[in-house]
From Swiss-Prot:
Principal location listed in the UniProt entry: cytoplasm
Gene that encodes the chain: apt
Name under which the protein is recorded: Adenine phosphoribosyltransferase
EC number(s) from the headed UniProt entry: 2.4.2.7
Tagged with keyword Ribonucleoprotein: no
UniProt key word Transferase: yes
One of the protein's GO biological processes: adenine salvage
Length: 188
């Protein structure tokens, strides 16, 4: 259950937004990298962030929170713990030790593949899928497809940040996946 954050700001979303550092021209020129490590370093900001997700999903009757490799692994297990549900990792190819299902998706230059253990969830299990941000939506779409192939009901895709100019959240919504993000940044 959510904890009361001492000295919580009146506008928690604006506060979370203010805690995210922008690193210009990283990892390549023209990219404005949205760095969540500054948010994570603040106990107050982390508590408020987790509370926002927990308040949203406390009544969703979830079975699991799935996290996308790698930064989705930071917040998703905390939210799963607070909701008293399991955590399902969706990893880059070759990182899971047991039998897996895989899903490839397109990148700007090439493609990538993510995997899930074939016994990660059961048909009918209710799952949200989490990442740090939604850019093009490719990773979250691949994660959703994997979960659905296992028979899970993917309730929603969730992230701290949306980069709406890159079109990922629109792509996901148009594919039938509801999306929740705490904040958004223009550009890429």
């Amino acid at each position: 259950m959510p904890h009361s954050s001492p000295g919580a700001p009146l506008d928690p979303v604006a506060f979370i937004h203010s805690q995210i550092r922008t690193v210009p021209d990283w990892p390549q020129p023209g990219v404005q990298f949205r760095d969540i490590t500054t948010l994570l370093q603040s106990p107050k900001a982390l508590r408020i962030l987790v509370d926002l997700f927990v308040e949203r999903y406390v009544d969703a009757k979830l079975d699991y929170v799935a996290g996308l490799d790698a930064r989705g692994f930071i917040i998703a297990p905390i939210v799963a713990y607070e909701l008293s549900v399991g955590f399902v990792p969706i990893r880059k190819v070759g990182k899971l030790p047991y039998k897996t299902r895989s899903e490839s998706y397109d990148l700007e230059y090439g493609s990538a593949t993510v995997e899930i253990h074939e016994d990660a969830c059961r048909p009918g299990d209710r799952v949200i899928i989490m990442d740090d941000l939604i850019a093009t939506g490719g990773t979250m779409m691949a994660g959703r497809n994997l979960l659905q192939r296992l028979g899970a009901v993917v309730v929603e895709g969730a992230a701290i940040i949306d980069l709406p100019d890159l079109g990922g959240s629109t792509l996901l919504r148009n594919a039938g996946l509801p999306v929740y993000t705490v904040t958004e940044f223009a550009g890429h």
